[in-house]
Amino acid sequence: MVKFMKIKSIAAKNLLSFDDFKITFEDGDVVTIFGPNNVGKTNLFRVLKLLRNIINEKISAVDLEIYLHNKNLKAAKIEVDVIFDKSDKEVIAKFLKIFFKINAPDLIRLCNNLKLNIINSIIDYFSAGSYIWECSELRCYRPYFMLRLRSLEEDIEKIKIYLKERELSEITPDLIDHSKVIHELDRNVEIIEVTNDLKNIITSSVNALITIYEKNEKLFFSTLIDGKENITTRIGDGNIENIVEISMKDFTKDIEKYEDCFKRLTMDKNILRAFVVLLALDKLLANKMSIYVKKVLEYSKENPWDKEIIEDLKYIVRFCGFDYRDIYEISDISLNDILLKIYENSLIFYEDYLPNEGKVMIPDYMIVELLAGLKNNSLEKNVKSKILELFKTSTTKDDLYLGILSMPSEKWIPSYLFYLKNNANLKLRKRYMKIKEMFEYIFNSGSLSFDVILANNKPDIVVYSEDIEIPLNMVGLGVKKILEILTLVFGYESKVILLDTPFNQLYPKYQKRFSKILKDTENIDSQVFIILHSPYFINNENIFNTFRFYKPKKSTKYICIGSIIKDLEKTFGTVILDRTTRKILLSDAVILLSSALRDIPLFDLAEYEDIPIDEYNIEVIRPQNTLSFGKYYALLQYTSIPYILMLRSWILYNLYEEIKDGEGKVRYKLLEKGKYHKIVEERLNFFKNRHPFWISKEEFDKVINIYIKTLEAHREKLIELGYIYLSSKEEVVKYCIEPLRKQLEDILRKKLFIFTVPTDFIIEPQDLKNIQIEKDKYIVHNYIGYRKDVLKEFKEFFDYFVKFHNLQ
């Protein structure tokens, strides 16, 4: 059973950084999103907030243009898939009870005769669906809900099994037993005609429903009011090609005519339930899925014994944000209004602090009375009774914060914690205790805790350690942030809480403890979305709801980290999610150093030549061997994290191998045709069926072919010159490496982002004494010299790399 409303997917078309974007979430309660700056992470939250603002009419169609991804395309769409929880269904059930009492008493009577609770039957179908908003130059629709009729789909599957067992392709009238009709009613022509008509209506309607399901593989029901409210166009995906006529008019316009016969028919329970649900949906459509307040009030006067309908109406009115005292000014409330309000009330954005700021759900005079009593210790017993009375009469369903007069927004934490701590509802008091427990866990080394007190007749918070008390406004920002986040995460239930980089001010130790709290989702009664830049929150517990956002060109894309980690662990047979992996995942780009260069202090050298490596989140990784290289390369490739390969030119362009003659003298022999340096051969073999994500396989193969052909052509030239053997490294550099580097360097740098350093790039301390005259050509760092010209080349190369990959 779903504990709370959950967002299952979010889709956005032509909005912000999203071209045609959809992200789907797994069953976990915590969703983690990370990635470089300015790639669209926060835009995901902005899309959810935009939908909320459109629902509550805080934004007009004219203002929407600034949100468009492509300003020339005057169209946009948002679709948010959700699963409802028990409390959401309770609200919908109250609405449906009122609706059917007012608009379909004949259907209720019919269902009662069948011993079928129409509300219970139909509310089961309100389990999941999509909030949809779409806008174009022609028209901007009000957001509506596309209900996924999963239970009805299950009923149809059972009907299909029922038919298969009888070797039938469709429901026939013979499957509906009318013997009871003949036995209990007159056998006149009229009764027989009504019975036959009724059986035909049932079979044709449910058969049409089965056909629609088989065409679509899913069943939907839209709450969009567009003047085309009929059951035929509303069941299914709305595609005209998939429409199958469902004819129920004869039955619905005169239920009384068929009632006596209908209740005496015997049929498969799934066929009966499917037909009744169709009747109910048809009634909803016929009345524009709305309850008209005037009709409800008239019904209440005529049926004073029905106290429930007025209580349900009050609940619905307040749920929709109206004051019941203004009931006569309210014309109607639609099912769409209810469903949209569920969405609006469910979202809590961290930057907003609270979703219903300014709405005082408990009268101010009661607050003043309560606070005055709390100040006077002699009224302790009266105070307790006042608190109980206050919170017993408050609306705890929405868990709105305690609006203390005109309390500024920064005071919401004391107000809300005061509300939880003193609530008559034990469940709410336990939330306060949980917040306090988690706060003390995070600060256990400092023995910190907090309490809610009254200061100047207003709730306030003091933080204390042993005998020292500090007001909340005097503690560090990190402590405040932790209390805010704990209050949001543990102080609410049935919410979708969206936290945008909430941990930036927190010391790493506290981030780590927070991550441990979020690993255990058993005590979290809301779905939590977190945008962050911390490695501590990337863990195996939530890995399948962990996503990396990136923007390869102008549109945001994402990668599910869990799927990648699972594939890599299967491929390499080892644990992938380690400390280095987490650092890579959070980086903007990675530099892979060959083993020969692993000791280069790259970040320190970059400062000498103003190479802007530290302006970006760059990780330098030093693979220990080919397997290690393969693991990190695959991770980078799957996650589309840009990378640089940095190695010595001696490796990439060398066609010679070192040998020793009989006297032990070192010489260099030209390798046979098709033979290269060992590392080059390993990499060529590795890339046989792979290619960097930023270029196509064809383009990559073309570059590799140019590389190999150039090496082979130069090998032939060396043979012609008689350079089969060379006597020194300097000769290998002069006749082999440098000529090849000049030919291939540009294409390898610009296409594959391979940067090579010459053999004399590094000057060891003992050799520095011999180059004092040329010291201005070297940077000396920790007694080792590095060629300045190579670093200047790397700066140009790095600038090109940044621009190519659009690093922000």
Swiss-Prot record:
Record GO terms (molecular function): ATP binding; ATP hydrolysis activity
Classification via InterPro entries: ATPase_AAA_core (IPR003959), Bact_Antivir_Def_Nuclease (IPR051396), P-loop_NTPase (IPR027417)
Coiled-coil regions, chain positions: none
Disulfide bonds: none
Classification via SUPFAM superfamilies: P-loop containing nucleoside triphosphate hydrolases
A Pfam family hit: AAA_21
Keyword set, alphabetical order: ATP-binding, Nucleotide-binding
List of residues binding ATP: 35-42
Source organism superkingdom: Archaea
ATP-binding keyword on record: yes
CDD domains registered for this protein in UniProt: ABC_ATPase
Family matches, as Gene3D superfamilies: P-loop containing nucleotide triphosphate hydrolases
Name of the protein in question: Uncharacterized protein MJ1542
